[in-house]
Amino acid sequence: MKKLLPLFVSAALGTLSSAVWAENLAEIYNQAKENDPQLLSVAAQRDAAFEAVTSSRSALLPQINLTAGYNINRSDQAPRESDLLSAGINFSQELYQRSSWVSLDTAEKKARQADSQYAATQQGLILRVAKAYFEVLRAQDNLEFVRAEKAAVGRQLEQTKQRFEVGLSAITDVHDAQAQFDGVLADEVLAENSLTNSYEALREITGQEYSKLAVLDTKRFAASRTTESSEALIEKAQQQNLSLLAARISQDVARDNISLASSGHLPSLTLDGGYNYGNNSNDNAKNTSGEEYNDFKIGVNLKVPLYTGGNTTSLTKQAEFAYVAASQDLEAAYRSVVKDVRAYNNNINASIGALRAYEQAVISAKSALEATEAGFDVGTRTIVDVLDATRRLYDANKNLSNARYDYILSVLQLRQAIGTLSEQDVMDVNAGLKVAKK
């Protein structure tokens, strides 16, 4: 499948060896395919829909029944006993029954719809796993930044206390540093909780516990703009989006249901036949007698519905209203796809600019912190200035980290909206991960 745009640009992208690191995106996705309840449920529904085709086709085939019986009759009015042995085979074959053909066609379309929904759920699983995975990495990065900020503010607090003891700083500087340090401690508690919850969200999908994941290789990470316009992408989505395809089939099924309901006005023709054998014996005090019979029959039966109390007309109207509803659902699905394609395409292009800006913001914030610390040492800047500069540096790092993950997810979301999201995309993203440092 042709890729929409590269996620990572590198001379050589090798997938992570499972012998070195098992808990990467590809491994977790494979676990999700085997254990995700949503996917397994939709798979079972798809199998049921295909089995319904066989059930609908059976109505067009001969219906053959074998019967047999042995009955003993006794009477109190006369000292006699009669035994009846019977057997028979009968068949019925529809020659014309419009509803049976429509039902078969509808069942086949529902099977295709279920297959499309299953494929859409597979794509949804890729996106759900990717979102949950990168939420863990996002929370992990945030915790690392908070802990780094805590260490930096802690050093500044100790330096401020020392300066206060020798008379170089006011007590208010100590209080300001202590206040920010306490705030960072609270942020650390929240960040740890967020990481725990993000791991739990990943466990919900696969049923497996995780403690450490492969991380994004930021040195090899590169973002690129989409090469096609939103209108060109929308055109592709019209043909390939799986949810849109399922909505179209749903409209077709609703149209067939009108035909199915109106077929109640049409006659039906069946070929019926059979063979029956019977042996009836009577036993009384005077004599023993019996009779045997063999019956053969075959014929064509016509059934014409003349009046059903208005039921057929009512069912037809219900089906017509349902068709209108399905048509509106299709229009809503189309508009949603158009919105998603444009939004995700815009998000990708916006992320490119944001990534560049955040990269520069990190450089600028680092330089600003160094300059502010130097100014504080010579008395031209206050501890509040240093603390603010420290916070800006770690905020810039967090924003840059978030922007990378947002870009990757936007690319995957766009591919899902177009209908091209596949397992190859999982492998492409997985190739941009690396073993985390201990």
Curated annotation (Swiss-Prot):
Function as written in the Swiss-Prot or TrEMBL entry: Outer membrane channel, which is required for the function of several efflux systems. Required to export RtxA cytotoxin.
Disruption phenotype: Increased sensitivity to bile salts and other detergents, erythromycin and novobiocin, but not to chloramphenicol, nalidixic acid, or tetracycline. Highly attenuated in mouse in vivo growth competition assays.
UniProt keyword Transmembrane present: yes
Disulphides: none
Highest taxon listed in the record's lineage: Bacteria
One GO process term, biological-process aspect: response to antibiotic
One function term, GO molecular function aspect: porin activity
Assigned protein family: Belongs to the outer membrane factor (OMF) (TC 1.B.17) family.
Protein name: Outer membrane protein TolC
Signal sequence, start to end: 1-22
Keyword Hydrolase: no
Lineage, top ranks: Bacteria, Pseudomonadati, Pseudomonadota, Gammaproteobacteria, Vibrionales
Entries under Pfam families matching the protein: OEP
SUBUNIT field: Homotrimer. Part of tripartite efflux systems, which are composed of an inner membrane transporter, a periplasmic membrane fusion protein, and an outer membrane component, TolC. The complexes form a large protein conduit and can translocate molecules across both the inner and outer membranes.
UniProt xrefs under InterPro entries: Bacterial_OMF, OMP_efflux, T1SS_OMP_TolC
Topology in membrane: Multi-pass membrane protein
Compartments where located: Cell outer membrane
Keywords: Antibiotic resistance, Cell outer membrane, Membrane, Signal, Transmembrane, Transmembrane beta strand, Transport, Virulence
GO cellular component, as recorded: cell outer membrane; efflux pump complex
Principal localisation: membrane
